[in-house]
Amino acid sequence: MTGNNRFTLTMICFGLVIAASVLIKQSASSEQNEPKPELTVHDYAQMNVAVEDVLKEMPEITEELERIHLGHIEDGMEELLSVKKAEFRIRVENNLTKQEHSTEFMRAMAEKETGRYVDALRVAKEEYGIRVAEEEVTEFIKKNVANVRSKEKKNYAEALGLTLYQLDYQFDRDFYVMDVLWEKLTPLVMEKIPKQDGESEKAYGERLKVEFLDQEE
């Protein structure tokens, strides 16, 4: 997936309204069964209002933005995978697409999605000996994300009061943890779960994720 397509998917699925369902942007999950509404240019023009409204209700995110401006960087995977940030993204997506999910429903989605991410990291470590290092996430962002400078991305960064660098390397950093994890895991999971006769690459890729995540149960 190209950097531009990756960011577009992130915006369309802003909060994993099923939880990447990352709401949407679930690199390590195949539960995206619900069709997501596509955002229009007009929707993006409302980004600032949508973000501002949610920030008023979630002071924790405002505090994180302030820490970013002060140069503080979360240095642990557990800190990166925040339920509050997942909930923030879901609520922004909810506002942009004019949906009417309750706060309780959106919080539950955020908790589920974040829990899946944490479990995926645990299974990768315990079953495959795979860990994700901060340096690997930084390198992934440098190669695949930082070069994307679309209008939508700039609008989002401005709505948050961040530079593109702060958005990519700090605020949205958690998005890319699972990308790095899956890149490292794929060869190992493929050895354990071979491709079936007649199975398409897409179907195989989705099945790999499903069967890997089943190990979390």
Region spans (language model):
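Short, low-complexity patches enriched in S/T/P/G
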Residues: M1-F7
